[in-house]
Amino acid sequence: MRHYEIIHTEDTRGFHVVFSVTPEECHLRDCFDLTETELIDLCEKIDRGIYAWFNARVEVYQQGILLGSDFLGGCLYDAPMTFVKESEYYDDMVKNAIQEATYNLEKLYESRNEVTA
């Protein structure tokens, strides 16, 4: 089981959003078309903490219940917060997770109405 570190939380559109990361297990050579020299240089910079190489996760909650999520692997940034503040991926992930949460809420309400009808 992977351990995720919470990096950022926010409340938006009636949902509590949690952004967390875990180290990427995939090797850089499997994700980028780099020369051997570029690959070695980049790996050294990751090892020294100059860059962060991670999987990103966005989870969306309402009243403490997980209703939606989105994941993205192969993220290479100066820091995970750079991903939040400067990439378009973070906003897309939040949007996708909220769409899933909204869908799940609608299904729950529908099934609840069927039970009580």
Model-derived features with residue positions:
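Acidic interaction surfaces
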Residues: 1-117
